[in-house]
Amino acid sequence: MEREFKWMIPDPSEFDPIADSSTVSALVQKKGRLEMEAMYYDTADNLIARCHGGLRLRRENETRVVCLKLAAESGFGGARKAREEYECTAPDIRTGIQNLPAAGAPQDICDCLLQANLIELGLTAFTRFWFLLSYQGCTCELAFDYGKLTRNGRVGPICEMELELKSGSEADFDALAVQLQQEFDLKPQPLSKLARMMRL
């Protein structure tokens, strides 16, 4: 189960003041940068959309990862999302779908996807600056994403901050997210990158 908070950031110049703040810097265990590019897919009858999910093949630097997300739940004014998430490394989308059941994905959905003609919905391309944080009883990743969404020749911006629980206490994770939102006056981003891309 993926659990994350997402906030809008008006301008990438606001990334560093948050990352360098005493609140965040004291928690950092590791940090890095990823160049990401993801193609999103669905079937002609919108199987993934009907499951309130997302299917993508994403390049993370030199690694390719297929990810299936299902059944999102929302809270904290739209900032927090919790959803089923299954992923595996794979060179292409169909190989990834074949391997997703071994990662826990529903076999029936994967079988339907393999039998269908997949349609490319659109593309995201962005740079991610990530920080692995340790806070009380949880470990989480803080990420700043900056780039663009592309669909049918139309382009939209990506400029956002995410906090994703990696392990440990959900209560401590929520407490840290609330602290960050209040301290930096963050505005919730209720829509995923896929949802915003589909609105282009």
Give the positions of each predicted feature.
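Phosphate-end processing signature that detects enzymes handling 5′-triphosphorylated RNA
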Residues: 1-200
